[in-house]
Each structure stands twice: as C-alpha cells, then as structure tokens.
C-alpha cells in the first residue's frame, strides 16, 4: 500500500497534471521536483520522530504519516476531479500543497518499512525480511498496483477513479501500519 501511493502519485503526477489541464509540462515537472525535495525532508523528520518520540517503534509514525498522506491524496484527487472548484492559480497552489503533503509523509513509511522488518524478526532472518519487504513493495506496490492498476484505471475509466484508487491504497496503508503497533509494543516490552 505504501509503495502503491508512492509510485501511484510519483509515476503519474506529470501526466495526470497535464491531462487534467492543471499544469503545463514544465510546471508539472517543477511540482514533482518539489514533491521529491519535500519528501527528503519528510524522511529525515520521520526518522527523527521515530527515534526520539516513539523510541524506535516505527508503526506509530507510519500510521501518522500514512494518515496525512491520505489527506494529501484526497486533496490531490478533489482538486483534479473538480470536487474543489477553484481558479487556475488556486488549483495549482492546492496541487502543490497536496504534493508536498504526500511527499513529506510517504517517504518516511517507505524508509521505515524496511527498518520495521529488521526490528520484528530474529537477527538471523533480518536480511531475508528486508529483502522480502523490498521485493514485494516493488513488485506489488510499484509494478502491479501503480503501473498496471492505476494506469489501467486511468486508461479504462478516468483519472478521477485512478486517483481515488490511490486514496484507497493510502487508507489500506493506514490500517496495515496500525496492525503492527501491538507487535512493536510487545517487542519493546520483551527487550526492556
């Protein structure tokens, strides 16, 4: 779900923004670049908060990040679909806000899912766990969900439906990340 959101927005942002006549090709590239720059800052902030506030537990931070990412995806979808009617200038501003929200909050969970896998398995299985998280993240989240599912929905139905499917992916991400809170709490108690 995390990779679906990352790549569902990342892979399609320039095309989506141009086909919806929200931005020109040059403007959409700048917006996507800002999304990535803000994402780098968000990754650092997420790592810091995980260490300092949640004492190394990744799940609570992932839930928070995925929730705010969901809000960003919903804003992105609502502006693009016309649910939020706005002037072209306000539309671009709202898209920038949405892309910044998504960027800031999605790259933390992307980084932390691998760390989380390392923390939750025995040390002798750490490499395998990290490998599986990466493999399935890219195969299912990027290749299947982002490229095939989101792209197929955009072509077969509409961009509005495609972006709504990314929002559903973000919502699923919130719930999947929340499922690990108890496991991390129990692990922290057993290591104390």
Where in the sequence are the language-model features?
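Extracytoplasmic gate region of multi-pass secondary transporters
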Residues: 1-43, 110, 141-150
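Cytoplasmic membrane-interface "Motif A"-like loop-to-helix N-cap segments
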Residues: 51-66
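A membrane-interface helix-boundary motif in multi-pass transporters
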Residues: 57-60, 148-170
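C-terminal ends and interior cores of transmembrane alpha-helices
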Residues: 67-87
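Multi-pass alpha-helical transporter architecture, strongest
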Residues: 76-80, 159, 164-192
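Hydrophobic core of transmembrane alpha-helices in multi-pass small-molecule transporters
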Residues: 88-108
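Intracellular juxtamembrane helix-capping segments at the cytosolic ends
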Residues: 107-122
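A late C-terminal transmembrane helix in Major Facilitator Superfamily
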Residues: 122-156
């Amino acid at each position: 779900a995390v990779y679906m959101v990352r790549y569902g927005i990342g892979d399609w942002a320039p095309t989506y923004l141009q086909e919806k006549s929200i931005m020109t090709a040059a403007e959409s590239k700048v917006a996507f670049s800002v999304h990535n720059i803000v994402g780098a800052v968000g990754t650092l902030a997420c790592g810091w908060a995980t260490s300092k506030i949640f004492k190394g537990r990744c799940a609570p931070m992932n839930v928070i990040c995925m929730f705010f990412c969901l809000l960003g995806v919903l804003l992105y979808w609502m502006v693009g679909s016309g649910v939020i009617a706005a002037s072209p200038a306000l539309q671009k501003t709202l898209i920038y806000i949405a892309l910044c929200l998504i960027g800031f909050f999605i790259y933390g969970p992307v980084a932390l899912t691998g760390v989380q896998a390392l923390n939750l398995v025995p040390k002798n299985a750490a490499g395998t766990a990290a490998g599986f998280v990466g493999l399935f993240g890219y195969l299912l989240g990027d290749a299947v969900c982002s490229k095939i599912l989101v792209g197929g929905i955009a072509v077969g139905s509409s961009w509005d439906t495609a972006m709504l499917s990314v929002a559903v992916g973000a919502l699923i991400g919130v719930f999947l990340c929340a499922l690990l809170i108890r496991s991390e709490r129990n692990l922290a108690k057993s290591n104390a």
